[in-house]
From Swiss-Prot:
Keywords: Glycosyltransferase, NAD, NADP, Nucleotide-binding, Nucleotidyltransferase, Plasmid, Secreted, Toxin, Transferase, Virulence
Gene3D superfamilies: Toxin ADP-ribosyltransferase, Chain A, domain 1
Listed name of the protein: Mono(ADP-ribosyl)transferase SpvB
Family statement: Belongs to the SpvB family.
Domain named TR mART core: residues: 373-576
Reaction(s) catalysed (UniProt annotation): L-arginyl-[protein] + NAD(+) = N(omega)-(ADP-D-ribosyl)-L-arginyl-[protein] + nicotinamide + H(+)
Protein localization: Secreted
Chief localisation class: secreted
A molecular-function term among this protein's GO annotations: NAD+-protein-arginine ADP-ribosyltransferase activity
Annotated GO CC locations: cytoplasm; extracellular region
Protein purpose: Mono-ADP-ribosylates eukaryotic muscle and non-muscle actin on 'Arg-177'. ADP-ribosylation prevents the polymerization of G-actin to F-actin, causing actin filament depolymerization, destruction of the cytoskeleton and cytotoxicity. Does not possess NAD(+)-glycohydrolase activity, unlike most mART enzymes.
Extra facts: In Salmonella spp. the spv gene cluster is encoded on a highly transmissible plasmid.
Superkingdom of source: Bacteria
Length: 591
């Protein structure tokens, strides 16, 4: 069993990432920001392709939480923005989307008014009306449709997220999945994902527990607190035996469904003895941690008294397994607890046979550090099998660009207005600047080096055999009339001064779709594991990519319907295709 803290940087440099079960990641060495990260898999059984995408994530810059300092298991959520102060819980507040991007209200038009009033969703009618407001990320990258539904009574609000792959996510439909002020139900700070459904009728249902006073000494500084705001992930159920097209939560707050799989997050209710398989049903009240703490960034107290002690995977096949709830796998978490700060120090995976027999545990933490090198230059000791190759600074720069640097960098490259303070902070945090008040020359040089590192990191990725990619643009704006003319002049050569993001899989619906043909030797690269948004395929091109306009197919022309039918669009909704006014066929010039 390995203790995480206490290693010197020299020791960490020699440690190889552990080989984890499928779905897990490894130790990531700290970059210029000084942050290290680890990802541990949860014992999640594969279903018919639709299982919860959850894992334990560690960041050395993370705060305290239900898994100890630095660790988290975040589900999809939407929250009010707090970086500019405490939310006012009115129309002046800003929201943060599931990817952390600020949300803005979608423009209202005559064809698509925003907001609208709804009494139903599909074939499901509601007993009241809802005001539905569409939002989108301020910087578009995920291409989902986001709707904020507000009912007639206080606290009766939730979010719908229509993913680009057709999956529908429901967030905060019931009070159990909303983090709100206990004294004001309408003051909701976070909406947690509560249900997801695929076009094939496969569902995932998330259950949460509210904080309470169980096993808490309610005297002293704990007296008089209202601790009911916090929500803990309790169960994730999936593998519904019978497919259903509609969300279960439309008609019931507690769906009565036959689930085949349940992932249980246990906070001490079922016992943590590794020799005793825990039961499916909680046997006791949950345990209290030694280092309770509170958060106040939303304007009310969010008190945390719990630690997740284990994660359990149950199967429900009574005819095949002989019992209703069969434990198959268990991630047992062990902590170094004290009243000051609790740290996760060990994570063991245990597997169980159908008769309850426990297989030998798998240690998921890092292997012990290798012995120190021999003195006196003796090189007879074999090389440590834990030695690894560090990730290059160029790949680190590309990874950060994909996560949050793309907006600033591309605005700078295009000569648009950009947040200079944010740019300086980025360069400072990535060690491209040594001061937050550089001269103009120092700033330009640092930006040049940073952009060059991103480009070199991109060029180091493997080439692919893709021959066509897509890009959606919104050019039908008065301010972009000159740009539209450039893109609609056959034979014209467009030079994109910024990094150009494209999709090899889907044509994102907008008024203009670029059908971009590639030749062997092009400089575009699939980001793959380097990408921050793992769910989407992205081919990125370096700055100053040249594209030649070969043909334009306008809406209403003879070839438009034929070419449109050949495109794989980002949304199957036929109404959205009316937004497409033109398809521009162009080719990347390698020279």
């Amino acid at each position: 069993m390995l203790i995480l803290n206490g290693f010197s940087s020299a020791t960490l440099a020699l440690i190889t990432p552990p080989f984890l079960p499928k779905g897990g990641k490894a130790l990531s060495q700290s970059g210029p920001d000084g942050l290290a990260s680890i990802t541990l898999p949860l014992p999640i059984s594969a279903e018919r392709g639709f299982a919860p995408a959850l894992a334990l994530h560690y960041s050395s810059g993370g705060g305290n939480g239900p898994f100890g300092v630095g660790w988290s298991c975040a589900t999809m959520s939407i929250a009010r923005r707090t970086s500019h102060g405490v939310p006012q819980y009115n129309d002046s507040d800003e929201f943060l989307g599931p990817d952390g991007e600020v949300l803005v209200q979608t423009l209202s038009t005559g064809d698509a008014p925003n907001p609208v009033t709804c009494f139903a969703y599909g074939d499901v009618s509601f007993p009241q009306s809802y005001t539905v407001t569409r939002y989108q990320p301020r910087t578009e990258s995920s291409f989902y449709r986001l709707e904020y539904w507000v009912g007639n009574s206080n606290g009766d609000d939730f979010w719908l997220l229509h993913d680009s792959n057709g999956i529908l996510h429901l967030l905060g439909k019931t009070a159990a999945a909303r983090l709100s002020d206990p004294q004001a139900a309408s003051h909701t700070a976070q909406w947690l994902v509560e249900e997801s459904v695929t076009p094939a009728g496969e569902h995932i249902y998330y259950s949460y527990l509210a904080e309470n006073g169980d096993n808490v000494d309610l005297n002293g500084n704990e007296a008089g607190r209202d601790r009911s705001a916090m929500r803990y992930l309790s169960k994730v159920q999936y593998g519904n035996a019978t497919p259903a097209a509609d969300l279960y939560l439309w008609t019931s707050a507690t769906p009565a469904v036959q689930w085949l799989f349940t992932l249980v997050f246990d906070y001490g209710e079922r016992g943590v003895d590794p020799q005793v398989p825990p039961a499916f049903t909680a046997q006791n009240s949950w345990l209290a941690r030694q280092d309770p703490f509170s958060l106040y960034n939303y304007g009310f107290e969010i008190r945390l008294h719990r630690l997740c002690r284990q994660v359990l995977m149950f199967h429900h096949f009574p005819d095949e397994l002989g019992e209703a709830d069969t434990l198959v796998s268990r991630l047992l978490l062990e902590y170094d607890e004290n009243p000051i700060l609790t740290q996760l120090c060990a994570a063991r995976t245990l597997a169980y046979e159908g008769d309850g027999y426990r297989r030998a545990p798998v240690n998921n933490m890092m292997p012990p550090p290798p012995p120190p090198p021999m003195m006196g230059g003796n090189s007879s000791r074999p090389k440590s099998k834990w030695a690894i190759v560090e990730e290059s600074k160029q790949i680190q720069a590309l990874r950060y660009y994909s996560a949050q640097g793309y907006s600033v960098i591309n605005k700078y490259l295009r000569g648009d207005d950009y947040p200079e303070t944010q740019a300086k902070e980025t360069l400072l945090s990535r060690d491209y600047l040594s001061t937050n008040e550089p001269s103009d020359e120092e700033f330009k040089n640092a930006m040049s080096v940073y952009i060059n590192d991103i480009a070199e990191g991109l060029s180091s990725l493997p080439e692919t055999d893709h021959r066509v990619v897509y890009r959606g643009l919104k050019l039908d704006k008065p301010a972009l009339s000159d740009v539209l003319k450039e893109y609609t002049t056959i034979g014209n050569i467009i030079i994109d001064k910024a990094f150009m993001s494209t999709s090899p899989d889907k044509a994102w619906i907008n008024d203009t779709i670029l059908n971009i043909y590639l030749e062997k030797g092009h400089k575009g690269r699939i980001l793959g594991d380097v990408a921050h948004f793992k769910g989407e395929a992205e081919m990125l091109f370096p700055p100053n990519t040249k594209l030649k306009i070969e043909s334009i197919v306008n809406c209403g022309s003879q070839d438009f319907a034929s070419q449109l039918s050949k495109l794989r669009l980002s949304d199957d909704a036929t109404a959205d295709t009316n937004r497409i006014k033109r398809i521009i066929n162009m080719r990347v010039l390698n020279s």
